[in-house]
């Protein structure tokens, strides 16, 4: 399979900051290692980036109480490792091209609930921004 012929998935991600400017990260249900990520996902047909970001954030964390601080100008993209192409996203994409946002969490931690309709995270925490490179999935 020539993976370069596969398109990039259109996606969004959000850096959620709490009152201490720590970043929300979730431990993925489908990743056995000690790797974490920020809420992110695909853009559905007919959605704009802001709508997709808010939907993904709610679907993954139940968080609604946010204020968007910034929409990053640059899009970021990543390619899946070869062993995951054909498995993730039913083999339709080779990676993701994402629009990222920074948002301030205005609620209480009790608002966060990972037991959603289709849970993606099994655990969550707030971390200092400088620790992100040490904990996030390496190809993202």
Regions found by a protein language model. Give the residues of each.
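A conserved beta-turn-beta hairpin within the catalytic core of GNAT-like acetyltransferases
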Residues: 31-34
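A short gly/proline-enriched turn/hairpin at secondary-structure junctions
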Residues: 37-38
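Unchanged
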Residues: 44-138
